[in-house]
Amino acid sequence: MQGTVCENCVEGRGSVDRVDLARLMSGLALFDHAARALPSDQHDDRDLADLVADVSRIGIFVSTQGNVFMEDLADDLASDLRSTGVRVDVLDETADIETRPPICLFIAPHEFFTLGRGTDWVRDDVLSEGFMFGTEQVQTTWFNLSLPFILMSRGMLDICTQSASLFERLDMAALHVLPGARHRPRPLTERDRRHPLYGVLPPAACGDMDPSLPFASRPIDVSFFGTSSPRRDAFFARNAAFFADYETFNYNRRPGRGPIRSEGEDGALTRLAGHVSGHSKITLNIHREEFGYFEWHRMVRLGMCSGSLVVSDPCLPHPDFVANEHYLQENARYIPDLLEWLLKTEDGAREANRVRANVDSLITNSFDTKRTVARMLRFFAQHRSRERR
C-alpha cells in the first residue's frame, strides 16, 4: 500500500474531469437556501468535559516546508482545542514517529507527506490510524496529491463544506470545520515593519489595526493578497485604470516563487496581509480559476476577522457565511461598479456597514468555540483507532 501511495503522489496519477466537476458544483449551488432551512445540529457542548477527558491528547502535524497559511490553520485549531482544556501538541515531520500522540491530525497531507522528512511518515500504521485535514480545491493537482492519504485515513476534516460532503457520499468519515472565526488584532514585529511592503503603506495605515475601525475611517480603499493566475491577471489588467483612482494594495505573488514560508521575509507576509486588511475598507476576493470555492483564509481569517468588508466574485455556498449578508457577491465583470458604489455613495456606505454588522454579530454570537471543539472531539472519539487509545 505504501508503494501505491508514493507512486500516485510522485507520478501525479489521477485527475478530476473539470466538466464533471462543474456539473456537480452547479448542483451544489442549490444547497445555499436548502441548508439554511434544515434544523440546526442538535448536538451541543454538554458532554464537552467527558469528551476532553476521553480524547485526552491530540497531535496536530504541519510541514515545516509548506505554506505558512497551513501553520495559521494548525495554530487556530490548536488554540480552539486548548481553550477547552484539550492537551494539544503542534508538531512537524521531525517529530518521533513512534511516540506520536494517540490521535494525530495531519494538516495539508499533500505537503506533510511529500516534503522533506515527511516521506518517512508514509507508513500503513500512520496513515490508517491518523486523521487528515484537507485544504485543497478538488480540481487541483494538490488535491490529487492529498487524495491517497485521505482515503487511507480514519477520517478527514475539511475547511470546505462541499469537499467534506463529497467524502461523506463515499461513506467516509468526514467533518466540515471552520476554525478560529473571531475578531483578532494582528500586531507586527519590528522586522515586519522593515519589510518593503510595509514601506509603501500610506502613513495612516502604519499604526496598529483595529477590527472595530469604522468603514469610512479605513485609509486603504481596496486590498487583495493572493497568488497570480491567468484569471486574476486578466481581471486586474482589465480594471487597472479603475483601481488607479483609489488607494489600493494589490499583492499578486508569482507561482514560480513557491509557497510562502514562515522564515525570512516571507514570514512577514501573512501578518502584513492581516494588517493591510485591518486598514482596508474592502478586502477583495477574486477566485484563481472558474471554480468559486469559499476561500476561508482570505475571506474570513484575513478579511472578516479584521473588520474589513469582503467583496467576492460568486462562491460556492457556505452554511454560515451567506452571500450578500456576510459578504457581497458580484460577477467579476461588474465588481468595479459595486466597488465604486460602496466607496462613493451614501447608500453604498450604509450597505457596507450593514454587512459588517452582520459579520460582527455572526462571529460574536454564533461561533461558540466550545460547540466547535465538541463536534471535533466527538468525531475523533467515534472514529479513532482503538489500538492507540
Model-derived features with residue positions:
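Conserved catalytic or regulatory cores that recognize and/or transform ribose-phosphate-containing ligands
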Residues: L316, F321-N324, Q329-I335, L362-T364, ...
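Intrinsically disordered, low-structural-confidence terminal and linker regions
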Residues: M1-F31
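Short, hydrophobic/aromatic alpha-helical segments in well-folded domains
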Residues: M152, M299, L338, N358-L362
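C-terminal "capping" alpha-helix adjacent to the active site of nucleotide-linked donor transferases
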Residues: N331-R350
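A charged, aromatic-enriched C-terminal amphipathic alpha-helix characteristic of glycosyltransferases
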Residues: E346-S385
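Nucleotide-sugar donor-binding catalytic core of glycosyltransferases
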Residues: D20, G27-P101, A108-D125, E129-A323, ...
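CheY-like receiver
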Residues: V276, L338-W341, F379
